[in-house]
Every structure is written in C-alpha cells, then in structure tokens.
Design a protein with these regions (language model features):
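Extended, low-hydrophobicity, polar/charged segments
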Residues: 2-185
Length: 185
C-alpha cells in the first residue's frame, strides 16, 4: 500500500492510503508504543523510575505475566476498575486474589460494579489487560491490596497487554496515593 504526501485535509501531517485517499490508521504497534510512552512519562512525573519490559506472547492475565516474568502470580498487580455510583475506582489487586465486592462496597460506602471495557478506556485511557496503576485520563481513587505489601517487588502493567514493569509495593502506594485496604479474598 502506498502513501500520499500530506496535502489538503492531510496538511496536519497525517498520511493517506493511495487507493482510498482516506487517512491511514496508525498500526497497533504504534498505538502500543504511545501507550507505554504515555505511562512512562506519567510514572516518572509521579516519582517512579520504571523499566518497562515487553513480552511478545503477552501479559494480559496474571498467570501470563507471572510466567513471562518468572515470578509468583501473587507478585502480579491486577489493575481493576470498578464503578462506585458514576465514579471510577481503581483496585490494585494481587494476581492470585479476587476483589471481594461486598468489602469494597462497604469501604467505599456505596454500591459498586465492575467497569465495562468502554468505561475502563474512558477513565484510564488504556485497554483492559494493559491498564497500568497510574497515568490515567482522569485521577482515580485507588485501593491497594495489602497482600502486595508482602513482597519486595511486584510487577504491574505498563500500558499494553504485553508490557510490565517491576516496582516496590511501597513506591506503588506512594505514586498512586493509594489506600491499603483489605478488600480481597
């Protein structure tokens, strides 16, 4: 597929497909790189020095991530978004645990539900499976699973389903301004 130079409606620098003259969509690789870069910039602005590692076979699930990294599944940070009324709340949960929705609702003092994919994307700017613990579209109230504190190092998503980064749990709590609360089982 050829590419036209930017002219007319593409003067902003966008490129067009020669056959259709429609704007060319960015590749998924470019979007993934942008997501990682956006996360990395936000993490460093929050005081975290991150070293993102990419795994082509994916780290979408906690088990996938643990296998790729070579750690225990409990050292994987699951970033789960819940809706508390109309406000999104982020729960950073140990990979081998599940959020106890009754405990979370009790802690938040309101009814909750797991957020849908479009709500996660709107609140965080990232897709499910690659949602990092910070760098979101809107500031999120964050709840951190105390079981993550049992480890010297944990691994969290870095913006894409194939990227993770290591972090000390105490640094994660500080960077996210998270509340360490027992809402898992």
């Amino acid at each position: 597929m050829g590419v036209l130079e930017s002219v007319g409606p593409f003067a902003s620098g966008a490129q067009a497909d020669v056959r259709t003259r429609e704007p060319r969509r960015r590749s998924s690789i470019a979007r993934r790189s942008d997501a990682i870069e956006r996360f990395t910039e936000e993490a460093e602005a929050s005081g975290l020095q991150v070293e993102v590692q990419r795994y082509p076979d994916g780290t979408r699930t906690a088990a996938d991530a643990a296998a790729a990294v070579g750690c225990h599944v409990d050292q994987i940070v699951k970033s789960l978004v819940f809706m508390a009324d109309v406000r999104p709340v982020l729960v950073l949960c140990s990979g081998g645990r599940r959020v106890d929705e009754e405990r979370l609702a009790s802690y938040l003092g309101t009814e909750i539900r797991i957020a849908g994919a479009s709500e996660v994307r709107a609140a965080t700017g990232f897709a499910i499976g690659g949602t990092p613990p910070l760098g979101h579209t809107v500031p999120l109230r964050t709840v951190v699973d105390p079981h993550l504190m049992d480890f010297d190092e944990v691994w969290a998503a870095a913006g894409t389903p194939d990227s993770v980064f290591p972090v000390k749990p105490k640094d994660l709590v500080q960077a996210t301004a998270g509340a360490v609360v027992g809402v898992t089982r």
